[in-house]
From Swiss-Prot:
The keyword Cell membrane applies. GO terms for cellular component: T cell receptor complex. One of its GO terms (biological process) is adaptive immune response. Keywords: Adaptive immunity, Cell membrane, Immunity, Membrane, Receptor, T cell receptor. Alpha-beta TR is a heterodimer composed of an alpha and beta chain; disulfide-linked. The alpha-beta TR is associated with the transmembrane signaling CD3 coreceptor proteins to form the TR-CD3 (TcR or TCR). The assembly of alpha-beta TR heterodimers with CD3 occurs in the endoplasmic reticulum where a single alpha-beta TR heterodimer associates with one CD3D-CD3E heterodimer, one CD3G-CD3E heterodimer and one CD247 homodimer forming a stable octameric structure. CD3D-CD3E and CD3G-CD3E heterodimers preferentially associate with TR alpha and TR beta chains, respectively. Its main location: membrane. It is found in: Cell membrane. This is T cell receptor beta joining 2-1. J region of the variable domain of T cell receptor (TR) beta chain that participates in the antigen recognition. Alpha-beta T cell receptors are antigen specific receptors which are essential to the immune response and are present on the cell surface of T lymphocytes. Recognize peptide-major histocompatibility (MH) (pMH) complexes that are displayed by antigen presenting cells (APC), a prerequisite for efficient T cell adaptive immunity against pathogens.
Amino acid sequence: SYNEQFFGPGTRLTVL
């Protein structure tokens, strides 16, 4: 992905 932000184990916010 273009930008990936991890906020915890198994949690990911992907901004395309």
